[in-house]
């Protein structure tokens, strides 16, 4: 079957990663000890995508857990599903990366990376037909961002034809751990642009706003933010884990979602959003789900899709509902808001339906958008980066680990290029002379098609 190897790196990556495993284990009827106690065969039909069936009939996640300090790993191990993971798949150092990208990417992380690759190789060898990898990490710290991107490029070297997907938590001044987050994030994006096929941008600022505004939490904790992330991750992987036709593997998703190789940063959304504990008392209709799902307030990235245009969209509906109604509602949204979808990619919205809803809900919908409005998120980081970099603030922490200022300059300009590429396609119309306005990607793809 088509397996996915999951890697989680750093504190944030391990926290949202282990939450992801709790949620999907629950959805597939896998107990914390790895035994199956589910209700239907649907839960097992594609279980091998994420789990390995051991000799004793227990299911073991195809997960590799990485960190440069033991703390977070210990709490995962002592957590509710800690015994589910393969003990050999915990790989950790003792030094920590101290929120320094250079330590994660060049020094401390580089020392540990071969051990991690050994474990990843072992997992990959246990696969029948590996489709690709998914990494959970944050871009603001040292390990997830620095070592996470190092792992991505090493995996890319060894498995060049496999899909690489990442769930990347983008830093925000509202929920900030460290002052150097803009540096770490920019250096990471510089890597992700080149080395991932699909990146889900999960943005602490958006999560914070959802908790505060929609869920009415006055002091959102990381636990609350991670609860939202796990809903989203469970939603966007539904098609990969349950039987179905559309976007049923990582590559098909990439083919549908990525019109130009560098523009692979997605904005996820989820509906219905209701405060943790007070699950919606009434089931929403398909129309309400669709409405909510496209609402800017439900986006997990702090960008307003109304400030840009959608290149492509994928929507996943979960629960028992009429396919016809789903199709009607999705067409309805596109017709009413046609100006927000680029007209030069016809049929750029794809919909999938899965019968099994998430726990506690009758129906739910997950949204994945490739919108040019994502440039707002990169602009925000870029401005903060430039403010500090102009004064060379905090640079000694990075140059002390052997980095060169040149690398900062390159990362900065790569991110600014990305922003202007999004802008260029936002303004493009179907009538534009394709060769003329884009010497780069659009021109090439256009010529090669003929």
Swiss-Prot record:
Keywords: Cytoplasm, Cytoskeleton, GTP-binding, Magnesium, Metal-binding, Microtubule, Nucleotide-binding. GO terms for molecular function: GTP binding; GTPase activity; metal ion binding; structural constituent of cytoskeleton. Its cofactor is Mg(2+). This is Tubulin beta-2 chain. Belongs to the tubulin family. Dimer of alpha and beta chains. A typical microtubule is a hollow water-filled tube with an outer diameter of 25 nm and an inner diameter of 15 nm. Alpha-beta heterodimers associate head-to-tail to form protofilaments running lengthwise along the microtubule wall with the beta-tubulin subunit facing the microtubule plus end conferring a structural polarity. Microtubules usually have 13 protofilaments but different protofilament numbers can be found in some organisms and specialized cells. PANTHER family: TUBULIN. It is found in: Cytoplasm, Cytoskeleton. CDD domains: beta_tubulin. It comes from the Eukaryota. It holds the Pfam family Tubulin_C. The keyword Amino-acid biosynthesis does not apply. Disruption phenotype: RNAi-mediated knockdown abolishes recruitment of microtubule end-binding protein EB1/ebp-2 to a wound site. Almost completely abolishes induction of nlp-29 expression upon infection with Drechmeria coniospora. Residues 429-450 have a biased composition (Acidic residues). GO terms for biological process: meiotic spindle organization; microtubule cytoskeleton organization; mitotic cell cycle. GTP binds at residues 11, 69, 138, 142-144, 204, 226. Disulfide bonds: none annotated.
């Amino acid at each position: 079957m088509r397996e996915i190897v999951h890697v989680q790196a750093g504190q944030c990556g391990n926290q949202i990663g282990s939450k992801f495993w709790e949620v999907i284990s629950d959805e597939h009827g896998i107990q914390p000890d790895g035994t199956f106690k589910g209700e239907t065969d649907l839960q097992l039909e594609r279980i091998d995508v994420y789990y390995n069936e051991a000799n004793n009939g227990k299911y073991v996640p195809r997960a590799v857990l990485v960190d440069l300090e033991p703390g977070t790993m210990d709490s995962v191990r002592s957590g509710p599903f800690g015994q589910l993971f393969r003990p050999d798949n915990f790989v950790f150092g003792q030094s920590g990366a101290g929120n320094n990208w250079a330590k994660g990417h060049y020094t401390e992380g580089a020392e540990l990376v071969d051990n991690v690759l050994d474990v990843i190789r072992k997992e990959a060898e246990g696969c029948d037909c590996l489709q690709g990898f998914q990494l959970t990490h944050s871009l603001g710290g040292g390990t997830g961002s620095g070592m996470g991107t190092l792992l991505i490029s090493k995996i890319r070297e060894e498995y060049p034809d496999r899909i690489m997907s990442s769930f990347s938590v983008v830093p925000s001044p509202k929920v900030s751990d460290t002052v150097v987050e803009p540096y770490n994030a920019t250096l990471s994006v510089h890597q992700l642009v080149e080395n991932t096929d699909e990146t889900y941008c999960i943005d602490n600022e958006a999560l914070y706003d959802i908790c505060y505004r929609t869920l009415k939490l006055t002091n959102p904790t990381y636990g609350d933010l991670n609860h939202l992330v796990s809903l989203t991750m469970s939603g966007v992987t539904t098609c990969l884990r349950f039987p179905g036709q559309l976007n049923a593997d990582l590559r098909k998703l990439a083919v549908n979602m990525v019109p130009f190789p560098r523009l692979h940063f997605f904005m996820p959304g989820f509906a219905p959003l209701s405060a943790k504990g007070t699950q919606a008392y009434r089931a929403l209709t398909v129309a309400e789900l669709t409405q909510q799902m496209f609402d800017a307030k439900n986006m997990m990235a702090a960008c307003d899709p109304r400030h840009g245009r959608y290149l492509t969209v994928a929507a996943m509906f979960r629960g028992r509902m009429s396919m016809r109604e789903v199709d009607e509602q999705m067409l309805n949204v596109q017709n009413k808001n046609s100006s927000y979808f680029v007209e030069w990619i016809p049929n750029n919205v794809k919909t999938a339906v899965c019968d099994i809803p998430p726990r506690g809900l009758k129906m739910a919908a997950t949204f994945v958008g490739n919108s040019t409005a994502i440039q707002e998120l990169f602009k925000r980081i870029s401005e903060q980066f430039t403010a500090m970099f102009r004064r060379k603030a905090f640079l000694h922490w990075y140059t002390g680990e052997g980095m060169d200022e040149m690398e900062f300059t390159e990362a900065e300009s790569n991110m600014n290029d990305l922003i202007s590429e999004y802008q260029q396609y936002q303004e493009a119309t179907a009538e534009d002379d394709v060769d003329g306005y884009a010497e780069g990607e659009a021109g090439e793809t256009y010529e090669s098609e003929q």
